[in-house]
Design a protein with these regions (language model features):
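N-terminal nucleophile
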Residues: 1-183
């Protein structure tokens, strides 16, 4: 939403192992300026922001293969970006060099001007155009039943409630309809 008072609007649910210990959204005493949920097992986050306007989120990628437990937690990718000063695009391109050190992931990173997507299951990062994008446990904008349903719903909300879409987006996220597991 370039030129808008709120240029980036993210609506997300945490789709994780619920038994994994975590803290809800809050500021991090040990990393001033960072806000997000916190993975108490590995110390990172699945979604975070920094007071300087940086934002990042990571999802696991389902491959159908056994998880190999890479040497670093994917949640640390988010923290590394939030604490850095590289643009979203530069960070994504630099991360490609060691992206295979992690189990499958998608990363969305926002530097205040541009939104980048990177997956270690794809050939190269992308800077995203304005619009509605969906991300689950495959590549960006993959046509899965749940992401297709959300894309349609989010598009309707943004068209009907562009002045204040948050309440309607939260209502969409409350839908607990379970899609068939086709992937």
């Amino acid at each position: 939403r370039p030129g808008h008072a709120v240029p980036l609007l993210v609506a997300a649910n945490r789709d994780e192992f619920y038994a994994r210990p975590s803290l809800p959204l809050g500021h991090w005493d040990d990393l001033p300026g960072v806000y997000g949920g916190r993975d108490l097992q590995a110390g990172g986050t699945w979604l975070g922001m920094h007071v300087d306007g940086r934002f990042a989120t990571v999802t696991n990628v389902r491959s159908g293969h056994a998880v190999r437990r890479g040497p670093r937690s994917r949640g640390l990718i988010v923290t590394d970006f939030l604490l850095g000063d590289s643009s979203a695009s530069a960070h994504a391109h630099a991360l490609m060099a060691n992206a295979r050190d992690y189990d499958g992931f998608n990363l969305l990173s926002w530097d205040g001007d541009n939104l980048s997507w990177l997956s270690n299951q794809a050939d190269a990062p992308r800077t995203l155009a304005s619009g509605v994008h969906t991300l689950s446990n495959a590549q960006l904008d993959t046509a899965w039943p749940k992401t297709d349903r959300l894309r349609r719903a989010f598009t309707r909300v943004m068209e009907a409630h562009s002045h204040n879409p948050v309440p309607a987006l939260l209502e969409v996220l409350r839908d607990n309809t379970r899609a068939a597991d086709e992937h």
